[in-house]
Swiss-Prot record:
Result of changing N267S: In ALS10; also in a patient with frontotemporal dementia
GO cellular-component term (any): nucleus
Sites bearing Phosphoserine, chain numbering: S183, S292
GO term, biological process aspect, one: regulation of circadian rhythm
Protein's name according to its UniProt entry: TAR DNA-binding protein 43
Gly residues: compositionally biased ranges: 275-303
Name of encoding gene: TARDBP
Note on domains (UniProt): Consists of an N-terminal domain (NTD) and two tandem RNA recognition motifs, RRM1 and RRM2, followed by a C-terminal glycine-rich region. Contains a nuclear localization sequence and is mostly nuclear; however, its nuclear export sequence permits it to transport mRNAs to the cytoplasm and even to synapses as part of neuronal granules.
Lineage: Eukaryota, Metazoa, Chordata, Craniata, Vertebrata
Comp. bias intervals (Low complexity): 342-358
Cross-link (Glycyl lysine isopeptide (Lys-Gly) (interchain with G-Cter in SUMO2)): K79, K84, K95, K102, K181, K263
Physiological role: RNA-binding protein that is involved in various steps of RNA biogenesis and processing. Preferentially binds, via its two RNA recognition motifs RRM1 and RRM2, to GU-repeats on RNA molecules predominantly localized within long introns and in the 3'UTR of mRNAs. In turn, regulates the splicing of many non-coding and protein-coding RNAs including proteins involved in neuronal survival, as well as mRNAs that encode proteins relevant for neurodegenerative diseases. Plays a role in maintaining mitochondrial homeostasis by regulating the processing of mitochondrial transcripts.
Segments of skewed composition (Basic and acidic residues): 261-274
Pfam families named in the record: RRM_1, TDP-43_C, TDP-43_N
SMART domains with a match to the protein in the record: RRM
Amino acid sequence: MSEYIRVTEDENDEPIEIPSEDDGTVLLSTVTAQFPGACGLRYRNPVSQCMRGVRLVEGILHAPDAGWGNLVYVVNYPKDNKRKMDETDASSAVKVKRAVQKTSDLIVLGLPWKTTEQDLKEYFSTFGEVLMVQVKKDLKTGHSKGFGFVRFTEYETQVKVMSQRHMIDGRWCDCKLPNSKQSQDEPLRSRKVFVGRCTEDMTEDELREFFSQYGDVMDVFIPKPFRAFAFVTFADDQIAQSLCGEDLIIKGISVHISNAEPKHNSNRQLERSGRFGGNPGGFGNQGGFGNSRGGGAGLGNNQGSNMGGGMNFGAFSINPAMMAAAQAALQSSWGMMGMLASQQNQSGPSGNNQNQGNMQREPNQAFGSGNNSYSGSNSGAAIGWGSASNAGSGSGFNGGFGSSMDSKSSGWGM
């Protein structure tokens, strides 16, 4: 007749009753069925209080001389398996410890001037235990700057506070991580979406009810005065991102959902994209190179505002390195032409070139860099190039080169 013996993994644990065979033995397979990896049993001797092992022969556990009795038997494990189990427990404990997120300082924006640190602490204490609050003040006047900092004990409290807007002393305030806490290389995954094309009859409660079908809505904000848009903040950033770009129907009106990205992030993206423009004298629509007195060559959509009659090359893309190389090449090539013209002028009767044809006087068109002040005194239609502070007038001849030695200016007469 079989009986049940009490077996446990540790002496202090609650035992499990395991059935024995008809001959009074216990199969090791019966033990391993309840304690995987077990290789034997042991028990504490009531007389000596020492641990004794149970005899094991070919997978069969034999009862002690006095029988199984009411003793509690402890399971034995191989040492290697026990070591592995201990290491697994230790590694899992380390992983759990690393998974615990630490809290950090949160910046509170839009604080009323009258709000004190005590007011701030009392408000945020309703969410959880507050470690620190601080209202930034002007060193000279001692007045509030309109923002402060707060830190909580629990990370869950921090997440909850960041997921919603806060009415503090009659004013809406935002609480978020400072910019220094966010990596610029990581993409910003916002939980807030922009809802465009809203109508005045849409209320915050209606928007909250509508968007609740997609996920938990933490906050709904409609700016006042009404400007035909609203902001909806979800608890999960993945839900917010999945709705971006969608056109949804609310109360029979089509609204467009997009990412509510802060302005400073948009500016950062424009800076990283390498675009030039928007500044006087730069690339783009606000002027260009060559705003000099001698007439410059403008890049982009310039309106020809140079004093010397600058010419535009159209709206094409060019970088500063290319422009500098082009200017250097032009100065070098035209300088060589000027030297050739000077040599020809020195071989003339008096160094003064006369126009050999009956050419009509026409205004010059000049390309220049620096403070060139060419005057239109060339005989014939001349396109003059000059550099440095030339103050004279270059005399050209038909189909050749012309130069004035007195003013050290050179021109190409055409």
